[in-house]
Curated annotation (Swiss-Prot):
Keywords: Hydrolase, Metal-binding, Metalloprotease, Protease, Zinc
Name of the protein in question: UPF0758 protein Shewana3_3770
Family note: Belongs to the UPF0758 family.
GO annotation, biological process: proteolysis
Sequence positions that bind Zn(2+): 173, 175, 186
Record domain MPN: where: 102-224
Residues spanned by motif JAMM motif: 173-186
PROSITE patterns the UniProt entry points to: MPN, UPF0758
GO MF term list: metal ion binding; metallopeptidase activity
Species for this entry: Shewanella sp. (strain ANA-3)
Length: 225
């Protein structure tokens, strides 16, 4: 049944306007963005099929254009709408870690890194630069590709830290496999970076590894002394 034929107030857009977005299911929120479905499928049905196909909203929004647009009912326009929504979410997260904000809430940092790095199809190694009061200076993506002890150059990290006059840093990278458990290579990278930063009297506060649904903190495991 087409959504326009549903009882008044039951459509996802009407429900959002009356009850608020928090009362909508994932499929209903997605249907608001999609606006319409295709023959035999209304927008909510199409949204459910997309979520099922990709295994969740995050995987759908991070999927490349060719994977999304090959599905019936989703062309370049709908793909663009989804990407705009995903980018808005990233920018909201970015505003939550504004320059000058003091990092007193570990959950805020985790949420930010999860939004920035989870579900990337390639590895990204990044650094969160902080001043002596642990206020945010900048978040910088340094390396992309296969991240191992040979591809992360401590001298580039040190150079950036000196350029930005950072007093402390948090480094992070993602695992495209979705499993956040650190590897031995991750531990070697961390040790090399900690030693390099110590030569310029800068503290490595943490190394966070981002998976699909969790973040592993080296500091919480006692791996950074």
């Amino acid at each position: 049944m087409a959504i326009k034929d549903w009882p008044e107030g039951e459509g996802p857009r009407d429900k959002l306007l009356v009850k608020g977005a928090a009362h909508l299911s994932d499929a209903e929120l997605l249907a608001v963005l999609l606006r319409n479905g295709l023959s035999g499928l209304n927008a909510v049905d199409l949204a459910r099929s997309l979520i099922h196909e990709f295994g969740g909203l995050r995987s759908l929004l991070c999927a490349p254009k060719h994977q999304v647009c090959r599905l019936p009912g989703v062309g370049p326009v709908k793909y663009a709408q989804l990407q705009a929504a995903a980018e808005l979410a990233r920018r909201v997260a970015q505003e939550n870690l504004q320059r000058g904000q003091v990092l007193t809430n570990p959950d805020l940092t985790r949420d930010y890194l999860m939004r920035q790095l989870a579900d990337r199809s390639y590895e990204v190694f990044a650094i969160l630069l902080l001043d002596s009061q642990h206020r945010v200076i900048q978040f910088v993506e340094l390396f992309r590709g296969t991240i191992d002890s040979a591809s992360v150059y401590p001298r580039e990290v040190v150079s950036l830290v000196l350029e930005k006059k950072a007093a402390a840093v948090i480094v992070c990278h993602n695992h495209p496999s979705g499993i956040a458990e650190p590897s031995q290579a991750d531990r070697r990278i961390t040790e090399r970076l900690k030693n390099a930063l110590a030569t310029i009297d800068v503290s490595l506060l943490d190394h966070m590894v981002v998976g699909d649904r969790e973040i592993v903190s080296f500091a919480e495991r006692g791996w950074i002394n």
